[in-house]
Amino acid sequence: TGSNQVRSKSVASMGGGPVALVGVTARMIGTGEDLLGEKLYMHQFKINGKRAFQGDVWQWHQDYGTWKNDDLMPTERAMNIAIFLDEVMPINGPLMLVPKSQHAGDLKASHDLETTSYPLWTLDEATVTKLVKDGGIVAPTGKAGGMLMFHGNLVHGSAGNITPYPRKIVYLTLNAV
């Protein structure tokens, strides 16, 4: 829809403060290291929000596509830790994940500069349809403070939020050293 609302805010533009402490929590990074089996560093720390009544869509994508093309991340040995700042409900634009899609590897993506205010490397409908046929779609929900971890190649997206309930999620992106 091309709205001009803020959809994502990185820690570099937020300054420090208590929220930045989450990014250096050894327990979180340690859990990621256990999952990927190697030492990790924090590549990115951001808050993605979907405002009440105005939260926009996130097209189907893999985060690694953006990290590779925009950040020049050399390999796909990366993951996200998502921490819910608001309750994530089936109705307020939860993440929709395609289970096991990370096993398809780094998929061909196109740079979408027009759909929303955030340029994103997105997947075509045929690719998403095949992956969904194989793995289905899940939309994890949870209370504020809930956590979700997923590989950078996991295909995901989310619908808009037209409810009175905001949905904010902190993301720690961890990458192999």
Pin down the residues of each PLM region:
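Extracellular structured ligand-interaction cores
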Residues: Q44, E76-A82, N92, I137-A139, ...
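Short proline/glycine-enriched turn/loop segments at secondary-structure junctions
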Residues: A159-T163
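A short hydrophobic beta-strand segment most commonly corresponding to one strand
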Residues: N80-I83, P99, Y165-V177
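Non-heme Fe(II)-dependent double-stranded beta-helix
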Residues: T1-D71
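Histidine-centered catalytic micro-motifs
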Residues: V57-G65, L154-S158, L172
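Active-site region of the double-stranded beta-helix
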Residues: E38, N69-T75, F84-P94, Q102
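Double-stranded beta-helix
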Residues: V88-V155
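A short beta-loop-beta micro-motif enriched in histidine and acidic residues
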Residues: G65-A78, G135-G136, G142, Y165-P166
